[in-house]
UniProtKB/Swiss-Prot annotation:
Residues 1-13 have a biased composition (Low complexity). Converts alpha-amino-beta-carboxymuconate-epsilon-semialdehyde (ACMS) to alpha-aminomuconate semialdehyde (AMS). Residues 1-21 are annotated as: Disordered. Monomer. Zn(2+) binds at residues 29, 31, 197, 314. Substrate binds at residue 70. Pathway: Secondary metabolite metabolism; quinolate metabolism. The lineage of its organism: Eukaryota, Amoebozoa, Evosea, Eumycetozoa, Dictyostelia. Keywords: Decarboxylase, Lyase, Metal-binding, Zinc. GO terms for cellular component: cytoplasm; cytosol. This is 2-amino-3-carboxymuconate-6-semialdehyde decarboxylase. GO terms for molecular function: aminocarboxymuconate-semialdehyde decarboxylase activity; hydrolase activity; metal ion binding. It comes from Dictyostelium discoideum (Social amoeba). PANTHER family: 2-AMINO-3-CARBOXYLMUCONATE-6-SEMIALDEHYDE DECARBOXYLASE, 2-AMINO-3-CARBOXYMUCONATE-6-SEMIALDEHYDE DECARBOXYLASE.
Length: 359
């Protein structure tokens, strides 16, 4: 059944009259934190952890070992504020995941597991209180294979989350590292969706200024993650693994020609694990729509296919799309069916969820 038929809903105006039917709008890429959490330095006995300084009623400073990292607004922790903004922007559902700085891959595995459980329980609670507006993705202590599989099973089988968010590397280990494969294998077995967000960006020591880790490092880091999974045979060995990469797949879609040419020119260097041309994997994974440019998004949809790009805004952060779906909706060349796929249908397919649950 086509997404156009299964994701259409009727919205209602303030006076109760029905507006024109439209498809579900689902933002796959949003971040949330608890309003408070324990003092992790005291709890675990060492530093490096994030804390929140609620210095006024609607803002908080994210601090790492007493040093300022980022200021956030109440929409980063308050579901009621988020719902107000969802209604304002005609967004039906947000998919919630933690802020990547909370991954804790550098920490002792038992502590990273404890924090992941705390964050996952929080997301599951937010979803349970607003099940028509929120869907949750869990976090894993990826530095420990056994603990990750344990928490993955809890997320999917006990908390009812449809998937997880992970970083683009784990303490410098690329995503083809053998220690990570059993986690991906379990994800495929459980049907769990895997959203991959860049963090600990490659080359960040050379990017001390101009916000370059976010502007240049993140797209490069995501491309590195995709190539690692392709060349390292993860997609080859796990053909049913569901993966979506943030930020439109980073620089990968725009350098696939170079990647393919290198594979063909030097198979002795590129095809040492997986003999399949990397272009063959286009359309085998998803990317979000967060590219900030009309021509880039048209190229991305044409390359990946209209069923493999899904709305993602990076809400509530300023580098995201500030009006969710505005770019998709503004492109005249996209048919209504294409827009419906991009705005919601593709997210539901990636997550393995029945649209009727949200109508």
């Amino acid at each position: 059944m086509e997404n156009k038929e299964t994701t259409t809903t009727t919205t209602t105006t303030n006076n109760g009259s029905d507006k024109k039917k439209r498809s579900l709008k689902i933002d796959l890429h949003t971040h949330i934190l608890p309003k408070n959490w324990p003092n992790l330095k005291e709890k675990y006995g060492y530093g490096g952890w994030v804390s929140l300084d609620h210095h006024c009623s609607c803002k908080a400073k994210m601090m790492i070992d007493g040093k300022f990292f980022r200021e956030i607004d109440s929409n980063c922790w308050d579901p009621d504020v988020r719902i107000q903004e969802l209604n304002r922007d005609d967004v039906d559902i947000q998919v919630l995941s933690t802020v990547p700085v909370m991954f804790g891959y550098w920490a002792k595995p038992q502590d990273a597991l404890d924090l992941a459980q705390y964050l996952n329980d929080h997301i599951a609670q937010v979803v349970s209180e607003n099940p028509k507006r929120f869907i949750g993705l869990g976090s894993l202590p990826m530095q420990c294979t056994e603990s990750s599989i344990q928490e993955l099973r809890r997320c999917i089988l006990e908390l009812g989350l449809p998937g997880i968010q992970i970083g683009s590397n784990v303490n410098g280990k690329n995503l083809d590292d053998p220690s990570l494969f059993p986690i991906f294998e379990e994800c495929e077995k459980l049907g769990a969706a895997v959203f991959i967000h860049p963090w600990e960006m490659v080359g960040k020591d050379r990017m001390p200024q101009y916000w370059l880790p976010w502007l240049v490092g993140m797209p490069a880091e995501t491309c590195l993650a995709i190539c690692s999974m392709i060349f390292g045979g993860v997609f080859q060995r796990l053909p049913n693994l569901k993966v979506c990469f943030a930020h439109g797949g980073g620089s990968f879609p725009f350098t696939i020609g170079r990647i393919e040419h290198g594979f063909n020119a030097r198979p002795d260097l590129c095809a040492v694990v997986n003999p399949i041309n990397p272009r063959e994997y286009i359309g085998k994974f998803w990317v979000d729509s967060l590219v900030h440019d009309e021509e880039a998004l048209k190229f991305l949809v044409n390359l990946m296919g209209e069923k493999k790009v899904t709305l993602g805004t990076d809400y509530p952060f300023p580098l995201g799309e500030l009006v969710p779906g505005q770019l998709i909706e503004s492109i005249k060349e996209f048919s209504e069916t294409t827009k419906e796929n991009l705005l919601g249908g593709n997210a539901l397919e990636f997550l393995g969820l029945d649209p009727n649950k949200y109508l």
